[in-house]
Amino acid sequence: MMLGQRADKESVDAIREELGLNQSLGKQYVDYLNDLVPISFYDVADGNQKLDKIGRYARLGTIGSTAIVLKAPYLRMSYQSKRKVSEILGEAFPNTLLLAFVSISIAMVLGLIIGILTAVINTNFLNKLTLFITTIGMSLPSFFAAILMAWIFGFLLEHWTGLSMTGSLYTVDEYGRGEFLSLRNLILPALTLGMRPLAVVTELTRTSLLEAMSMDYVRTARAKGLKPFRVICIHALRNALNPVVTAVSGWFASLLAGAVFVEYVFDWKGIGVVVVDALDKYDFPVIMGAVLLIAVMLVLVNILVDIIYGFIDPRVRIS
């Protein structure tokens, strides 16, 4: 893979030894975990070649020929580009994070507005129409929605929308004067990625708000003569937000992992394009690093949601 089809056995064996692929799977797994943890142990009997690869570190001590070092997590080197995986992911992850944040923001704002309006108006026709649209939005695959959005708004209606089928956050100037920020390239990927969470947030807001408005405390607030806006927004909506926050947090975390197809269709330079390219070239360190990064983001988002719960619902606060 790295040496081509005409590589000799000696070169292949040398590469396997350099990458540690000649070790047992258990030893490779332990070595990978050792590279990830902040305090690591490295054998320096043959020199500091391993330490030189990991970048900055602080040597805490030495036990025999084993050095104890303090460092940032080391995700290895890419097989293809010979660059650090952390650098590759560091360049791509901000674009994915921005795309996911804009998508979930669109879904949150529009979903709350539409859900509140349909719950307040609450007519049979409007409920059926909302259910029909949200069902289509939830059942539409992301890759098909991306192709459809790119074809309609980036190709057929390009003269009216001014949007391109592909493009990233920064576009290279056609006269060679460098890169410039192009936020319009964010519109189609963000709308496409926000379709499914928008449908979920809309339906959850509507059903949760209808249930909350039938509670006794809402009837009491109305009986006291409070304005309808205050009753809905202060009393009913606040208690109806718990399932919405749960859905938004889950979707935001999944957008970080599930934006692969959308990014690939729109050529958005994020984690998705990096993962697809790594899969195509069997670049396993990049794949493992991307999976690990997404898993860490899932954990962090869930922790953040638990903290937000305490502000929304005092009943779940830890005393």
Spans of model-derived segments:
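Membrane-water interface segments at the C-terminal ends of transmembrane alpha-helices
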Residues: 132-166, 192-198
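Residue-level recognition of pore/gate-forming positions within transmembrane alpha-helices
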Residues: 6, 135, 151-152, 235, ...
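An internal, D/E-rich "acidic patch" concept
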Residues: 23-108
